[in-house]
Amino acid sequence: MEIFTDDWVDAKEMNYKYPDTFDYPTQIELDNIAIGDSIKISNGLERFWVEVKEKNKIYLIGRVDNELITNEYKLNDLVMFENKNIYDIRTKEDKQFYFKKLLNSQKLKKRK
C-alpha cells in the first residue's frame, strides 16, 4: 500500500505565531502517543484526523480517519508525518469515552 507524504503544516510554528487559533500538544502528550490514537494534522488546505499505525523517533504513519475534500489521498490511505505536524491528539481512551457518550445519547433519543 502506498504511503503518502505532503507539505504538512508545522503546527508547532503555527501555534507560536497564532496561539489562539492553532493548538499544539505538550511534549509529554507527544511522547505518549500510542498506536491507535487519533492525531489531527493539516496539509494547508484542510485539517484532518489520522489513526496512528506506526511510530518511531523520526516519523509516524497514520491511516486517514475521515473524508477529505481537497487531497490526492482519501479515507483509509496511509500518510507519514512528524511530531511537529500534530495539532491535536485523541487517545484510544478518549475515543472510547466519546463513543460511549454518543451511544448513550442515541439510546436516550430512541426512548423519547
List each language-model region with its residue ranges.
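Intrinsically disordered, low-complexity, charged/polar segments
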Residues: 1-9, 13-16, 71-110
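Central antiparallel beta-sheet cores of small beta-barrel/beta-sandwich binding domains
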Residues: 6, 29, 35, 54-55
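Charged, amphipathic alpha-helical segments
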Residues: 16-27
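Short coil-to-beta transition motif at edge beta-strands of beta-rich domains
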Residues: 27-46
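Short beta-strand-centered aromatic/proline hotspots
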Residues: 46-57
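Beta-strand-connecting loop/turn residues
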Residues: 57-58, 84
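Short, solvent-exposed secondary-structure boundary/capping segments
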Residues: 58-66
